[in-house]
């Protein structure tokens, strides 16, 4: 069988250009293949192992688990999609697009993306975790139309409770932020107290529904 003929989530696609996205945040290792329309063709996600009752991991442990998970997940992705069709790689290099934003866990994704891009001779696009959230929200709302506009966006997660002004996602200005506990942290703390694993957002949402 040749390129494009594999069974799985990449089979039967006629779009010839694909982008591989990599994100190694403080919570999960994530891989996704997108086509030129911005549709997810194939995706893999693995939450980092956190001991019961704990509220996260040390950065050194997060980096270790990402480093272990990435080769395994790339192999899983390759079994479902022909990675020779990838034309570009995008990766989160830090939490937010501001000076001083840094977490070691993102180095795992950057290293994997850089090696993949250089080996194939394809473009490498460095972005941030927050810009990834913003782009996903805009796609979910109105697709590509909002990428040409300035929009106000609330980013509520484990590490942020921010009001953002997004200009085509490439330029993000923080208009307001929490000076206390972030919303996602509050949800996780409640969830862990209730006996759920970390992160607990999905379980708390199901309980509240």
Predicted regions and their residues:
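Conserved phosphate-binding catalytic cores of ATP/NTP-utilizing and phosphoryl-transfer enzymes
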Residues: 16-17, 122, 126-151
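A short helix-loop
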Residues: 17, 24-25, 42-43, 147, ...
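Short beta-strand segments
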Residues: 23, 90-92, 128, 152-157, ...
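Short glycine-rich, Thr/Ser-proximal phosphate-binding strand/loop in the N-terminal lobe
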Residues: 25-64, 172-174
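Short beta-strand scaffold segments in enzyme catalytic cores
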Residues: 29-35, 135, 153-155, 161-165
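Short, well-ordered amphipathic alpha-helical segments that serve as non-catalytic structural scaffolds
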Residues: 44-46, 65-81
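Short beta-strand-loop/turn "lid" adjacent to the catalytic site in phosphate-handling enzymes
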Residues: 75-114
């Amino acid at each position: 069988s040749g390129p494009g003929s594999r069974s799985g989530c990449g089979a039967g696609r006629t779009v010839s250009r694909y982008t591989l996205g990599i994100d190694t945040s403080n919570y999960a290792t994530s891989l996704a293949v997108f086509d030129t329309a911005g549709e997810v063709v194939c995706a893999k996600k693995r939450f980092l192992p956190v001991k019961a009752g704990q509220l996260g991991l040390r950065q050194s442990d997060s980096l270790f688990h990402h480093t272990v998970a990435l080769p395994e997940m790339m192999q899983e992705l390759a079994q479902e999609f022909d990675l020779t069709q990838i034309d570009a790689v995008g990766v989160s290099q830090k939490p937010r697009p501001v000076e001083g934003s840094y977490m070691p866990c993102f180095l795992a994704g950057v290293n994997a993306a850089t090696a993949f891009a250089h080996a194939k001779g394809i473009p490498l696009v460095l972005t941030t975790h927050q810009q990834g959230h913003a782009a996903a929200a805009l796609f979910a709302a109105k697709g590509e139309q909002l990428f040409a506009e300035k929009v106000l966006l609330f980013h509520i997660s484990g590490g942020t409770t921010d009001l953002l002004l997004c200009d085509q996602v490439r330029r993000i200005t923080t208009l307001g932020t929490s000076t206390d506990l972030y919303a996602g942290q509050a949800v996780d703390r409640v969830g862990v107290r209730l006996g759920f694993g970390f992160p607990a957002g999905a379980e708390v949402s199901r309980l509240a529904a």
